[in-house]
Regions:
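Receiver (REC) domain active-site loop signature in two-component systems and cognate sites
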Residues: 58
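Acidic catalytic/metal-coordinating carboxylates
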Residues: 36-39, 62-65
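Two-component/phosphorelay signaling modules centered on CheY-like receiver
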Residues: 11-32
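Interdomain helical linkers/hinges and coiled-coil/dimerization scaffolds
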Residues: 92-141
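Short hydrophobic/Thr-rich beta-strand motif most characteristic of the beta2 strand and flanking loop
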Residues: 25-35, 43, 91
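Active-site residues of response regulator receiver
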Residues: 7-8, 55
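Active-site beta3 strand of CheY-like receiver
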Residues: 47-53
């Protein structure tokens, strides 16, 4: 079961994300929610979520600041960015900082979110398999 932390300053979005999918039926567990990056940091340290779904525009610590912070701390999980903004610069910045994918809130559908999550978990599994293979064979890059 993959753990997910949802970060968004809009309560309705957090409620919608919790109810958009039967999470556990698809192998996911929502370990918590936060209203901004600053509030999320202790939850990340406590739960070590596999996947973080974060908004970009939030008070106190926005999504880009959170991604930068997590990159500095060498966060091993994946980050999916949700936003209302079709702002190419924000998308590009989030992806360059290491976000796995970017989804628009207004266009999010259960099948779209699930496809994104499945793509992300497949990437995580491939990375883990590759690391295991390297450790077993003693080959380093």
């Amino acid at each position: 079961m993959y753990t997910i932390l949802i970060i968004d300053d809009e309560p309705i979005v957090k409620i919608a994300l919790r109810s958009i999918l039967p999470w556990e039926e698809h192998g996911f567990f929502i370990c918590g929610t936060a209203s901004n990056g600053l509030e999320a940091v202790p939850l990340i340290e406590k739960h070590h979520p596999d996947i973080i779904i974060t908004d970009l525009k939030m008070p106190e610590m926005d999504g880009l600041e959170l991604i930068r912070f997590l990159k500095e701390k060498e966060y091993p999980g994946e980050i999916l960015v949700l936003s209302n903004y079709e702002d190419f610069d924000s998308v590009r910045s989030a992806l360059l900082l290491g976000a796995a994918d970017y989804l628009l809130k207004i266009k999010i559908q259960p099948d779209t979110l699930l496809a994104c999550l499945n793509k992300t978990t497949k990437k995580m599994q491939n990375t883990a398999d590759r690391k295991d293979s390297i450790l077993k064979t003693g080959i380093t890059e």
